């Protein structure tokens, strides 16, 4: 695909009709990692697990050539950065194994063995089970998690009824078996990053990913995906504050600022209330738009 998009004749035709930019969607490696095998993307490559170009689309060299070809016709290539979550790649698997500070990369919590009875059984061959409403309430009451979020995106009875899932027992690098509960705003194969961990590992990962797209691949603009879901906070009663949170605003400003400093621009699609969209647009992404897409939601 990338090779075809970098064709000079194609760009001559695009230039003739006034095309100044091409947004090709996420092309970096996505999906998961189980055992010694990669697993497919569960959400159209919006579950990134690395900065390498997925061979299904081509090579890094072909992406770079696409940018150069676009520039030759006074146009730019736009890429994506996904600040709120990853796929279940090596980083998540290291977090499950309690390796160094990797658990801090994700919004995940270890459940004490005496409370494993609150967790659902994980089917053989699966790597997680979605929590039911009563389990979320029980874990919230014990102080493990912040509780139900304001809404359940991708809600599907029997598949995703809450935004929390539990792992089976996982053997850690220290020889201890643990079960974790982790947050996922979207599908359970898209664990949410923790933007409030003292390690600031999530910020380092996402900023590094953005700069890789700009400085290595040659993208001149980045779409910020689901950047309105970076902060979540328990309110003591009722549902947790998970949309329009100040941390999302600050995180958006940080990421957009780094992108501008690197000489590029950013744009965002926000599936939020109008007031939250206005707040997120202050000092953050340079452009905003709304475009409904199947299974992902828009405005």
Where does each model-flagged region fall?
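Internal alpha/beta core interface subdomains
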Residues: 196-199, 203, 210
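Active-site groove signature of glycoside hydrolases
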Residues: 82-85, 210-233
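Active-site-proximal substrate-binding groove within the catalytic cores of carbohydrate-active enzymes
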Residues: 299
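Outer-membrane beta-barrel transmembrane strands
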Residues: 58, 206-208
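Acidic/aromatic-lined carbohydrate-recognition and catalytic surfaces
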Residues: 1-199, 230-288, 293-295
């Amino acid at each position: 695909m990338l090779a075809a998009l970098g064709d000079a004749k194609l760009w001559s035709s695009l230039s003739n009709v006034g095309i100044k930019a091409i947004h090709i969607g996420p092309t970096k490696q996505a999906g998961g990692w189980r055992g010694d095998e990669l697993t497919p993307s569960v959400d159209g490559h919006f579950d990134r697990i690395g900065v390498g170009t997925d061979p299904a689309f081509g090579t890094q060299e072909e992406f770079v050539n696409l940018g150069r070809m676009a520039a030759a016709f006074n146009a730019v290539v736009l890429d994506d950065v996904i600040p709120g979550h990853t796929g279940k790649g090596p980083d998540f698997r290291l977090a499950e194994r309690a390796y160094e500070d990797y658990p801090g990369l994700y919004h995940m919590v270890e459940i004490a063995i005496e409370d494993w009875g609150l967790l659902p059984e994980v089917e053989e061959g699966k790597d997680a089970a979605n929590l039911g409403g009563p389990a979320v309430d029980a874990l919230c009451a014990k102080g493990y998690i912040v509780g139900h979020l304001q809404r359940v995106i991708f809600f599907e009875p029997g598949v995703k009824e809450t935004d929390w899932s539990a792992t089976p027992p996982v053997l850690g690098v220290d020889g201890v078996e643990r079960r974790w509960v982790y947050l996922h705003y979207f599908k359970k194969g898209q664990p949410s990053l923790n933007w409030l961990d003292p390690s600031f590992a999530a910020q380092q990962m996402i900023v590094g990913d953005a700069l890789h797209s700009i400085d290595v691949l040659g993208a001149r603009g980045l779409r910020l995906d689901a950047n309105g879901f970076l902060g979540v906070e328990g309110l003591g009663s009722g549902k947790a504050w998970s949309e329009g949170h100040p941390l999302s605003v600050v995180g958006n400003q940080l990421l957009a600022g780094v992108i501008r400093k690197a000489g590029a621009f950013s744009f965002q699609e926000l599936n939020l209330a109008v007031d939250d969209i206005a707040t997120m647009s202050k000092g953050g992404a340079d452009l905003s738009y709304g475009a409904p897409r199947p299974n992902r939601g828009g405005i």
